[in-house]
């Protein structure tokens, strides 16, 4: 693991952290039981198999 050679100032640390942004999950349309829902792509298979409750929102 990389270790810093010098201490990083508080201002530099906070400005570096502020650049990090979370990305929104890409929603994909899926039809389950005749109803259309939008779910993240990683949950698509679970939604089709009925492993997650899509009516609870």
UniProtKB/Swiss-Prot annotation:
GO CC list: large ribosomal subunit
Disulphide linkage map: none
GO biological process: translation
Basic residues bias spans: 1-19
Keyword Transport (UniProt): no
SUPFAM superfamilies, A to Z: Zn-binding ribosomal proteins (SSF57829)
Protein name: Large ribosomal subunit protein bL32
A Pfam family matched in the record: Ribosomal_L32p
Keyword Iron: no
Annotated family: Belongs to the bacterial ribosomal protein bL32 family.
Organism of derivation: Mycobacterium ulcerans (strain Agy99)
GO molecular function terms listed in the Swiss-Prot or TrEMBL record: structural constituent of ribosome
Segments for region (Disordered): 1-21
């Amino acid at each position: 693991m990389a270790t810093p050679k010098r201490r990083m100032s508080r201002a530099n640390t906070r400005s570096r952290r502020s650049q990090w942004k979370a990305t929104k999950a890409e929603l994909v349309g899926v039809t389950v039981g005749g109803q259309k829902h939008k779910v993240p792509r990683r949950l698509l298979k679970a939604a089709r198999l009925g492993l997650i409750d899509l009516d609870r929102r």
